[in-house]
Structures are given as structure tokens and as C-alpha cells.
UniProtKB/Swiss-Prot annotation:
This is LYR motif containing protein 1. Residues 93-107 have a biased composition (Basic residues). The gene is lyrm1. Belongs to the complex I LYR family. It comes from the Eukaryota. Residues 91-118 are annotated as: Disordered. It comes from Danio rerio (Zebrafish).
Amino acid sequence: MSRANVLSLYRRVLRIARSWKAQSSIPKDTDTEKKYITQEARTLFRQNQQITDPESIQRCMEECEARIEIGLHYRNPYPRPTYLPPMGLATQKGRKLRAQQRLRKQAKPVYLQSQDET
């Protein structure tokens, strides 16, 4: 991915933030959500600006696109939570914690890849 594509995506997020209207139509909520979108974009783009691997850049851009689409569809800028119980994924016999951690990482949706594991 080229620098121009990344900057174009960043500008798109900022344009969405500028024209965002909260689902509740309350001006305070709209301002809060606009600030969240802008701050989240700034934080994640700056956090990832040192990435040079094309595959990693592509994954970050896919995550951004997914979050944009989900946010626009549901009119909610916040990432959707995932509900996976700590040891809720099935494993084969003999494999315990490492397998669970790997399965949890694989089960994480693309739009939450940048979120810390809680």
C-alpha cells in the first residue's frame, strides 16, 4: 500500500468525523462521538506510522475500513465488543493455555485487531 492510500483513508475518517451525527441526535453526544472518532484515528495512525511491512499495513487498512463500515452501518463509532469466555474455545486433549491464547487471537475480528486484549 502506498502512502497516498493511507493518507486518503485518514482523510476519509476525518471527513466522516466532521459530518458525524449521533444516533441520539443530542448535540453533546454528537460532539463526544466526533471527538472520539478523531482521537481514535489520530492515535491509531500515529501508533502505526512506523510500520513498513506491506502485509501489516494492509491489515491495518483492512481494520480501518471494517471499523468505518461498521460505524456507519450501526451509527456507532465505538468498536463492537466480542464475547468470548476466557476458556470458551474448544481445544484438543493435551493443549491448554497456549492453544487457548492462539485460538482467542484467531477468533478476534479484524475490526478489533488494534485493541488491547482485556
